[in-house]
């Protein structure tokens, strides 16, 4: 039986619902020897900023039970290097490229969106709103509805590309943030970003990470992420991209049944460079084995069975 794995997200038709999560495969080309990028629904590259960033002081990453905490600090070569050097090289992989952007002010987000508008090789923008707003005392944009709306609105006004707002879980009620992003013009939402976390080195009696705090990802956050997708699916009508601890196709199915139209594989890529392709292949096999002709039949299905 031929099954349909294609999904529609923010005006894009993706061959399957499996994406890479930003920051876990670099700009994609680093993983090309190990991961068939053309077999993915889309490649989400690591976050870029207006100017190059050196990132946080080391140590930047540490393992925890069932997860990883990272504090890389958005190290990247800047948007001009992306446009000039990286995007032209990605064209050979035949996969939609979604560019993640971040700024320290609303104006920086607007300028990034404007700079990338019309650049060949970009399918959509993912707006990383978990960054601190330097004009508001370092409060992350994505933790407050008005700041979320301000960023998304400026990005929307400065680009014709589809806009995907990436939501932070470090909030009281993620539904209010989702509604703010939707009201400001987001075409889709991705969730969740990492959970704020830290580890203390008990021998040295000091925080282990150079930045003190980091972002927790991996299987430890999956139940939190599934809950968030479930709630946001009930609150807004936008397509959702679910992420957070997806290691297998079974994990991905949890997100899809909770309401995600697509999923992003992140931390698993650090363990197995071919993880995202394996999830995509195993999802297709699941559909065949279960006699399900179209993966879209499963989107939000758990809500229709008494949830």
From Swiss-Prot:
InterPro entries linked to this entry: Aldolase_TIM, DHO_dehydrogenase, DHOD_1B, Dihydroorotate_DH_1, Dihydroorotate_DH_1_2, Dihydroorotate_DH_cat, Dihydroorotate_DH_CS, Dihydroorotate_DH_I
Enzyme Commission number: 1.3.1.14
Alphabetical UniProt keywords: Cytoplasm, Flavoprotein, FMN, NAD, Oxidoreductase, Pyrimidine biosynthesis
Active-site residues from the entry: 131
SUPFAM superfamilies reported for this sequence: FMN-linked oxidoreductases (SSF51395)
Recorded metabolic or biological pathway in which this protein acts: Pyrimidine metabolism; UMP biosynthesis via de novo pathway; orotate from (S)-dihydroorotate (NAD(+) route): step 1/1
Cofactor note: Binds 1 FMN per subunit.
GO CC annotation: cytoplasm
Enzyme class: oxidoreductase
Residues binding substrate: 46, 70-74, 128, 193-194
Cofactor: FMN
Entry binding sites for FMN: 22, 46-47, 128, 166, 192, 218, 244-245, 266-267
Record's subcellular location: Cytoplasm
Record-level GO BP terms: 'de novo' pyrimidine nucleobase biosynthetic process; 'de novo' UMP biosynthetic process
Assembly with partners or alone: Heterotetramer of 2 PyrK and 2 PyrD type B subunits.
HAMAP family: DHO_dh_type1
Family the UniProt entry places it in: Belongs to the dihydroorotate dehydrogenase family. Type 1 subfamily.
Main function: Catalyzes the conversion of dihydroorotate to orotate with NAD(+) as electron acceptor.
Protein's name according to its UniProt entry: Dihydroorotate dehydrogenase B (NAD(+)), catalytic subunit
Biological classification of the source: Bacteria, Bacillati, Bacillota, Clostridia, Thermoanaerobacterales
Gene that produces this protein: pyrD
């Amino acid at each position: 039986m031929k099954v349909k794995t294609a999904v529609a997200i923010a005006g894009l038709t993706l061959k399957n619902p499996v994406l890479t999560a930003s920051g876990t495969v670099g700009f994609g080309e680093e993983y090309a020897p190990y991961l068939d990028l053309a077999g993915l629904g889309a490649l989400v590259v690591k976050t870029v900023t207006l100017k190059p960033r050196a990132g946080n002081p080391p140590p930047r990453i540490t393992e925890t039970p069932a997860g990883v905490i990272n504090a890389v600090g958005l190290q990247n070569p800047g948007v001009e290097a992306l446009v000039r050097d990286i995007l032209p090289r990605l064209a050979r992989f035949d996969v939609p490229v979604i560019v993640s952007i971040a700024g320290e002010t609303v104006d920086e987000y607007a300028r990034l969106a404007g700079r990338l508008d019309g650049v060949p090789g970009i399918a959509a923008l993912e707006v990383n709103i978990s960054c601190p707003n330097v004009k508001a005392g370092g409060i992350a944009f994505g933790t407050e509805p008005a700041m979320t709306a301000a960023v998304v609105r400026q990005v929307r006004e400065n680009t014709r590309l589809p806009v995907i707002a990436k939501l932070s879980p470090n909030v009281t009620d993620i539904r209010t943030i989702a509604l703010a992003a939707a009201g400001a013009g987001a075409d889709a939402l991705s969730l969740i970003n990492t959970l704020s976390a830290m580890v203390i080195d008990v021998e040295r009696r000091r925080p282990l990470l150079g930045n003190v705090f980091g972002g927790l990802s991996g299987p430890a956050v999956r139940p939190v992420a599934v809950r968030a997708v479930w709630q946001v699916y009930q609150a807004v009508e936008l397509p959702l991209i679910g992420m957070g601890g997806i290691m297998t196709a079974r994990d991905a199915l949890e997100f899809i049944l909770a309401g995600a139209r697509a999923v992003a594989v992140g931390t698993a890529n650090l363990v197995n460079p071919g993880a995202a392709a394996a999830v995509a292949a195993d999802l297709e096999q699941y559909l065949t084995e279960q006699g399900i002709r179209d993966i879209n039949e499963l989107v939000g299905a758990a809500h229709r069975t008494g949830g």
